[in-house]
């Protein structure tokens, strides 16, 4: 709830701490999940449908505004879409202390992963926020180039195939998370530095 977020941010300001937020509008996500399940859309692809970029962009903007009112800097984790990146970029242009972190997975994998005919393949890529299309990836790379996004992380949270299969028939029960810790730096070098998108520094 926003009142709890504001109170938490105020306490962080008192302590000199910087809060981290995973920005998605959970109320809207829950409504979309219920609608998709009612329509028997229960596979891994529905995970992405239930978490469109708008729920992330709205939540990112709201968290930024609340943090600013509380007088605390903010670190936004798992930035996956243009809407969230733009909220961060605009806030930084206004002098707000906001930092954004895309994941290597969001920079390189897109939403087509969820349409894979092999259920296990698609489920192994279920994470939140979900993968987006190439336009969102381009925005994230541009943010890293321009400095409006600062860190590339992994949110490493791997599950076995058996664990992922607990969501067969109900995408909301697929454990959210993928690996990435070991691969992050080589992939960032190959697809960032070697392509000229990023410098070594």
Predicted regions mapped to residue ranges:
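Histidine/acidic residue-rich metal-binding segments in metalloenzymes
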Residues: 1-152, 168
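Short acidic-hydrophobic catalytic motif
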Residues: 155
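C-terminal structural cap/anchor segments
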Residues: 177-201
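Basic, amphipathic juxtamembrane/active-site segments
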Residues: 162-173
């Amino acid at each position: 709830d926003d009142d709890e977020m504001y109170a938490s941010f105020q306490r962080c300001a008192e302590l000199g701490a910087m809060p981290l937020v995973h920005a998605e509008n959970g109320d809207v996500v829950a409504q979309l999940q219920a609608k998709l399940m009612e329509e028997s859309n229960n596979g891994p692809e529905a995970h992405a449908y239930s978490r469109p970029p708008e729920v992330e962009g709205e939540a990112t903007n709201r968290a930024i505004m609340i943090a600013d009112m509380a007088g605390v800097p903010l670190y936004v984790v798992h930035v996956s879409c243009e809407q969230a990146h733009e909220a961060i970029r605009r806030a930084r242009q206004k002098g707000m202390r906001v930092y954004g972190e895309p994941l290597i997975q969001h920079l390189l994998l897109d939403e087509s992963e969820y349409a894979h005919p092999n259920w296990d393949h698609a489920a192994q890529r279920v994470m939140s926020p979900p993968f987006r299309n190439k336009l969102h990836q381009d925005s994230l790379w541009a943010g890293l180039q321009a400095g409006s996004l600062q860190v590339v992380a992994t949110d490493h949270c791997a599950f076995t195939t058996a664990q992922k299969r607990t969501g067969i028939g109900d995408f909301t029960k697929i454990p959210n998370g993928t690996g990435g810790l070991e691969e992050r730096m080589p992939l960032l070098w190959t697809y960032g530095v070697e392509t000229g998108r990023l410098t070594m520094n």
